[in-house]
Amino acid sequence: MPLHEIAFWLAILAVLPGALGIWLSGIAADWLVRRSPKGRLWVASGSLALLIPFEIAYALAGSPGLALAMSAITHFLGGAYLAPTIAFAHSQVTPRQRASASAVLLLGLNLIGLGIGPMLVGLLSDAATAQGFGTAGLRYALLAIIPSQFVALALFLRANAIDAPPLPSSKE
């Protein structure tokens, strides 16, 4: 498959499954939170736990077709933590604090996820390529950042373990 076709399909398979993951995880989180106050965190934790093996499979895919399939799954699961995380953050603050909570959360997500993450993958890929790994440098760079997903999962699981009641004023 030519590079321009792979790029086209990677773009499509990032946007559509990512948006679907955000939307469906929001629906699942809304349903689960009626059964348990931790329902939103369960969805975020579950999506991250499921994401890790698919990220590994994506990085190690031996064919463009498999890589594209894994890309779709990783973008679906990679977006699935977002809606429950934002909803959870809003449930932990008063209505007057929601804009600030959103600003802090989105600043962190964008600085790390959209700023540092891609830059780090690029730097690691360039370094691996310069060390003689050739085109496999990107594969190793993608694998090298997977431990950050374990950190995120551990933090979500820790948040699940906290038994703090919601703020009384956070109810609408």
Question: Predicted segments — roles?
Answer:
Residues 1-17, 42-44, 136-143:
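Loop-to-transmembrane helix entry
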Residues 52-61, 142-172:
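Multi-pass alpha-helical transporter architecture, strongest
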Residues 14-22, 106-118:
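Glycine-rich segments within core transmembrane alpha-helices of 12-TM secondary carriers
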Residues 37-85:
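C-terminal transmembrane helical hairpin of 12-TM major facilitator-type secondary transporters
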Residues 33-35, 89-98:
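Paired intracellular helix-loop junctions of major facilitator superfamily
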Residues 39-42, 123-147:
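A membrane-interface helix-boundary motif in multi-pass transporters
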Residues 3-5, 95-105:
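Loop-to-transmembrane helix entry/capping segments in MFS-fold secondary transporters
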Residues 21-37, 125-126:
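Helix-to-loop junctions at the C-terminal end of transmembrane segments
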